[in-house]
A protein has these predicted regions:
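Conserved donor sugar-nucleotide recognition element shared by glycan-biosynthetic enzymes
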Residues: 10-14, 36-39, 242, 246
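Active-site-proximal alpha-helical scaffold in enzymes
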Residues: 38-50
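Short catalytic-loop micro-motif centered on adjacent basic/acidic residues
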Residues: 28-31, 58
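C-terminal catalytic/substrate-binding lobe primarily of soluble NAD(P)-dependent oxidoreductases
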Residues: 49-295
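Rossmann-fold NAD(P)-binding glycine/threonine-rich loop
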Residues: 1-26
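Glycine-rich, histidine-containing beta strand-loop boundary motifs that form or position
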Residues: 1, 32, 61
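Active-site nucleophile and cofactor-binding loops and adjacent substrate-binding regions
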Residues: 31-36, 238
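Short, surface-exposed connector motifs at secondary-structure boundaries
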Residues: 24-28, 257-259
Length: 295
């Protein structure tokens, strides 16, 4: 029952080694890009400073990036995107634990900040759903990605044709993986920076009861403008947004601001030092207060 029950979940093998890392007095920090990574830090920050009870932690990712000269050019690894989007998405609920749904389930329109606007988002398998419930008290944890109807259609077609498979097939005298062929036919996302325009947004939407006892809904987010990241770092927005977070984490570990033993996710560590240092890098985060449902 792949669309109801989980199998081996993301992180299971890593967390199985946690005791060995603890006994060795060493820290294994997992999931420290932007999503997972910064999104988990946002969840920690919301739980520590903004909410007394959390109903849902929902990571929401969207963008308005375009690539000049291409009808279809993903701005992130198509190999990884196929893996994430066609695997059964995982959801966590306090009363059920972890469970799965069909790909692209529960579509919703989420309005992103900085002028990106409304984007259709769907459930996608992602590490935050496996990490956040381990350290943050919530009723529900989800991850939804703003893929858009065209991208979803392409992924569904690849799946129908078997081109998402990693099992080698014979082509003439060669043995090749269909997914590797798809990746080879598309441009390397890291080389698209000078052809890209627009913004990408990673963030964590949190609902529940605020520290004042009133219903509260917020979206903590990080937006990167491709023009800025190219001008400042010579790197396209999606790549830069992913890469800056492990740099921040390494600095915090080196300074002792982040410390621990065992296998830990970012939400197991204090959020404020991370958010402060990220801002010092000239790429601040933001928080939008939103009107709670039914208010």
């Amino acid at each position: 029952e792949p669309y109801r029950k989980t199998g081996v979940k993301l992180g299971d093998e890593q967390f199985a080694l946690a005791e060995r890392w603890e006994q060795a007095g060493k820290l294994a920090l997992v999931g420290i890009g932007v999503e997972p990574g910064l999104s988990d830090v946002f969840a920690r920050h919301a739980a520590d400073t903004m909410f007394s009870e959390i109903n849902e932690v929902g990571v929401r990712d969207g963008a308005n990036l375009t690539v000049a000269g291409y009808d279809f050019a993903p701005t992130f690894s198509i190999w990884t995107t196929i893996e994430e989007c066609l695997n059964p998405p995982v959801i966590w609920e306090k009363d059920r634990g972890w469970f799965t749904t069909p790909p692209f389930s529960e579509p919703e329109t989420f309005t992103f900040p900085a002028g990106i606007g409304p984007v259709e988002c769907v459930n996608v398998e992602h590490e935050e759903v496996l990490l956040i419930p381990r350290w943050v008290e919530a009723q529900r944890v989800t991850f939804k990605y703003g893929l858009g109807s065209e991208f979803i259609g392409v992924l569904q077609t690849l799946h129908k044709l078997g081109l998402d498979s990693t099992d080698p097939v014979r082509v003439g005298g060669a043995s090749v993986s269909p997914r590797d062929v798809v990746a080879a036919c598309l441009p390397d996302p890291a080389t698209l920076g000078d052809k890209m325009s627009g913004l990408t947004c990673a963030g964590t939407w949190v609902t529940g009861t605020g520290t004042d006892g009133a219903p509260r809904e917020v979206y903590l987010y990080h937006v990167v403008d491709n023009a800025w990241s190219m001008a400042e770092y010579g790197s396209q927005a999606v790549v830069w947004q992913t890469a800056v977070n492990p740099v921040v984490a390494l600095e915090l570990i080196d300074s002792g601001a982040w410390a621990g033993t065992g296998v830990l996710g970012p939400e197991a560590l204090p959020a404020q030092p991370f958010l402060d240092l990220l801002t010092e890098y000239g790429s601040p985060w933001g928080c939008e207060e939103r009107t709670p449902a039914g208010k």
